[in-house]
Amino acid sequence: AQSPWYMENNALDFTMEVPGQIMKCIWNFWDYMGDEEFLRTRAWPILKDLAIFYEAFARRGWDGKQFNLEPTVETESYGVSYQLKYTRNCTGTIAMFRWVLQRACEAAEYLGEDQDLIPGWKEVAENLPPYPKFKVGSGEVVGANEMAFPRFTRGDHFMFTGYFLVNQSDEINLDSPQELKDMM
């Protein structure tokens, strides 16, 4: 049986991390092959356009510091919900926005191109919201979004949300502090 949280809609239109996931595959080709021509002519134009879009999509919050990402829908959980309650600052979106913006800065600096775009990308990447965390019996865990307490019911993909920081953005790895690894 399918989880009642899934429904026929255009929810995937708001899964903003998916373009970043695709970009990561392209970046990994460059990263492993080191083909500068590939970076300059193929990867960079896509990465640059995606970073420009991500910077424009992020909205500065009322505090004047944090950039919020809404509407966003987690790919593994919480489709479009009533009054869009579960569509703000999703973990996968935060992870991939930060990853894309950081790689765009790195590539622009390496290639010596579009230096004027770097400050805006850095500002957004450094001021994205913290990952939503929730206390559970075993400690703190990363949740799908800031309004959605993790659900551990049949049909839900709860286990993937915390792993986004490992398998999508590489923010948590073997060299990370133990307290970060414990949240996965």
Where do the language-model regions lie?
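Flexible glycine/proline-enriched surface loops and loop-helix/loop-strand junctions
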Residues: 6-8, 78-86, 148-151
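Active-site core of glycosidic bond-cleaving carbohydrate-active enzymes
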Residues: 11, 15-36, 41-44, 91-184
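Conserved functional hotspot residues or short segments at active or partner-binding sites
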Residues: 47
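Generic alpha-helix signal with a bias toward terminal, lower-confidence helices
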Residues: 50-51, 79-81, 175, 180
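Acidic/histidine-rich catalytic neighborhood
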Residues: 52-110
